[in-house]
Amino acid sequence: MGSIDSNYDTESAGQCRPLEPEEFRKQAHQMVDFIADYYKNIESYPVLSQVEPGYLQSRLPETAPYRPEPFESILKDVHKDIIPGVTHWLSPNFFAYFPATVSSAAFVGEMLCTCFNAVGFNWLASPAELELEMVVMDWLASMLKLPNSFTFLGTGGGVIQGTTSEAILCTLIAARDRALESIGVDSIHKLVVYGSDQTHSTYAKACNLAGILPCNIRSIRTEAVANFSLSPDSLHREIEADVAAGMVPLYLCATVGTTSTTAIDSLSPLADVANDYGLWFHVDAAYAGSACICPEFRHYLDGIERADSLSLSPHKWLLSYLDCCCLWVKRPSVLVKALSTDPEYLKNKPSESNSVVDFKDWQVGTGRRFKALRLWFVMRSYGVANLQSHIRSDIQMAKMFEEFVNSDPRFEIVVPRVFSLVCFRLNPFSKSDPCNTELLNRKLLEWVNSTGQVYITHTKVGGVYMLRFAVGATLTEEHHVSAAWKLIREGADALLCS
């Protein structure tokens, strides 16, 4: 049990005003200056943090301060202790993973979200929050030219989740419960789900959380000749084998723009198979979906009208800050039936009238933030035209990098570029042992990242180790791409001459 602190200072405690408007105004101005200076000087920091594991614990006290500390002292410690341990995702020299894009518009939208601190679990708790989210989800659906079956103006609807993981989990639970109504809960062990060996790793995690047995997760092999896209014929064979074995096909997750190489699963032929067997057909377009607001890329979503759900993450490419994943479903009632809660303390007339949407029933948790403000500010501040230009600019810079790679015979493009990701490797001796080539590229990756000037990552697909160069950080310009290529070539020179 605890004990009363005999040194408790009631006078000092009584002076604490956690939200005094003028003090907030002063500190907020200081923080905005701090953030603006950080963005302005971000290139002065190593892109990839150079600290060792456990570095921070030795720098900070073992216990929280008993007395308040000046705001200026806290900011000073951010400079001294926190920034050295930050990998700078907003650096224009960050070419790793996929980008987490930002903008001034999204930032001020986030400020308002934090300002209101509304917990919009149902309509009554925050009417504007719920209704604005419905509006921006329909706006984005229109930008993507989704059918009305996915919009609130039509028969479907959309909700902002935190990440793709949550979007997949929610739709998987909805599909599971719908199936179990027919076959009985005791048959959950018969449910089988499908994806490719390029489907994001979060899929398996969501399946485990939804009670799908690991042995019932089908990860269908893809081939380099098909650019690692999921084969409808292979899917059909897997399903046929499962049906013959008495299993129950449940769910298919296709991907438009896989994480490793941006492979694109062709939706229409996959929909043929999924619809024939009554699978819930989900499309994960977390990264590449945003590009489909550009007419020249929209065809990658052809067939989406035959899917049950679609998710994409504006925080990756639509300047919207983390976290923001948009999920659309054709039949919201199926999702709501699986995820709804109705405790007495949340009962209210608008909800009971069925005239409003309660987003708590569209997600795993109950509480939710006013994330729609970020998208609303971004869409209104930049307009569709500028968002399209932003995406096209990133893709053009990736094309430029691709041309650099093709101009040096020591390097090769491993997988055809589609969007703003270039998958390449150093392969100066085309007939050399693959193990030696992999080791050489591992060394090149380590050399480049150790400089702190650039950060890139790798993947391994079809047994081939390759480097990933993902253009997309908000501040990246052509000269950053040129400088990154120059550094990569220097690394290759150093390794090949050693």
Curated annotation (Swiss-Prot):
Induction: Induced by methyl jasmonate. It holds the Pfam family Pyridoxal_deC. Its EC number is 4.1.1.105. One of its GO terms (molecular function) is pyridoxal phosphate binding. The keyword Transmembrane does not apply. Its cofactor is pyridoxal 5'-phosphate. It comes from the Eukaryota. InterPro entries: Aromatic_deC, PyrdxlP-dep_de-COase, PyrdxlP-dep_Trfase, PyrdxlP-dep_Trfase_major, PyrdxlP-dep_Trfase_small, Pyridoxal-P_BS. Belongs to the group II decarboxylase family. This is Tryptophan decarboxylase TDC2.
